[in-house]
Amino acid sequence: MATTYEEFSAKLDRLDQEFNRKMQEQNAKFFADKPDESTLSPEMREHYEKFERMIKEHTEKFNKKMHEHSEHFKQKFAELLEQQKAAQYPSK
């Protein structure tokens, strides 16, 4: 069964969205376990804030990198389709 570029692209987009959603769910679960800020010392509050920022930054970077990989795969797939088309229908 041949896969079209649109099908391939849509599948990668769905996977990117699903991955992003799962990362957000994991982060939400993690942040939900944070103790009440009123019970934290200023040092621990600062520690939690830095850690939350770091997790959010890493999540954003990772999601961006996954999206970049997907775009690269889409480009390569389009190139392969063009090569296949050229091989099947060589110009005279």
UniProtKB/Swiss-Prot annotation:
A minor in vivo processed fragment (IVP) also exists, probably as a result of proteolysis. The keyword Cytoplasm applies. The keyword Glycoprotein applies. Keywords: Cytoplasm, Cytoskeleton, Glycoprotein, Methylation, Microtubule. It is found in: Cytoplasm, Cytoskeleton. InterPro entries: KMP11 (IPR004132). Its main location: cytoplasm. Belongs to the KMP-11 family. May be involved in the regulation of the cytoskeleton through interaction with the subpellicular microtubules. May be involved in parasite mobility and attachment to the surface of the host cell. Strongly stimulates T-cell proliferation and is thought to play a role in the immunology of leishmaniasis. This is Kinetoplastid membrane protein 11.
